Amino acid sequence: MAFVHLHNHTEYSLLDGLTHIKDMVRRAAELDMPAVAVTDHGVMSGMVELSDACDAIEKETGKRVKPIFGCEVYFTPDESLRKDVKPKLYHLLLLAKNNEGYHNLLKLVSESHVDNFYYKPRT
């Protein structure tokens, strides 16, 4: 039975991740994992690097590691979007199922930085 890590933080998760994407993809290929996800805190900065690393490892080893695009967002109830209230933040892991989901996730994360940033990007 195949195993896939669906919750991984990389160097793009400030103060929380240490893993380099290329190293993670290489290790996933060594362990014959069919896929690996990147779910950094509040950002989608590593998605192109993840895709490129998966393509590169397939060319190098012949093993395909499918990239799974995701984000661990800081979810907050509507009343916590006000800046005069201490925000209640909950971690919510979101994974893109397909291209439409990927674009929706990009939109959510972008809006969290542009419209709802208060100490952290809030969704």
What are these regions (language model features)?
Residues M1-T123:
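Phosphodiester-processing cores and adjacent nucleic acid-binding clamps
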